[in-house]
Amino acid sequence: TDGISYYYEHETGVNQIRLNTITAIPADITSGDYDITQKVVRGAATNMADLRGDGENIMRVSRIVPDFINQSGNTIIQLDLRDYPNETAASSSLGPFTITSSTTKVDTRARARSIALTISNTAVDTSWKLGTFRLDIQAGGRR
C-alpha cells in the first residue's frame, strides 16, 4: 500500500531484531586439526611436545587458557578429539566449557592424536573477538 516503507539497518548490534522480537545470532568457528611429535634430543625422548606433528603420538591436554579480546555474555569452548584422520570427532567428556569474561583458565583431561577447538555462542547479547588461545599439551606416548 502507499506510504509503507521498510528501513533495514545492517552490521549493528549483536542480535536479530525482527517485528519487535529479539533473537540471538548464533556464531561458531572451528580450528583445523593439530597434532604433535615428541621432541627427541640426541636420540632420547624428552617428553616435551613439538608442534610439527606427524599424528604418531597421543597428546594430553590439561588446561585451556582462553583469550578473548572483547567478550560480552558467555561463550562455549569444545575440544574435538580424533585418534584417526577419518574418524568422527568426539567431544571431550568433560566439556563443552562455558567461558565468561572472568574465566582465566579451564582445567581438563583430554587425550587424542589430533585436536580441534570449536568456539561458539547461541545466546542473546553475546559477542566475542578471538585472541590467542593457549593449551597445556604434553606428549602422551604412542598408541
Spans of features found by a protein language model:
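Beta-sheet repeat architectures centered on beta-propellers
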Residues: 1-143
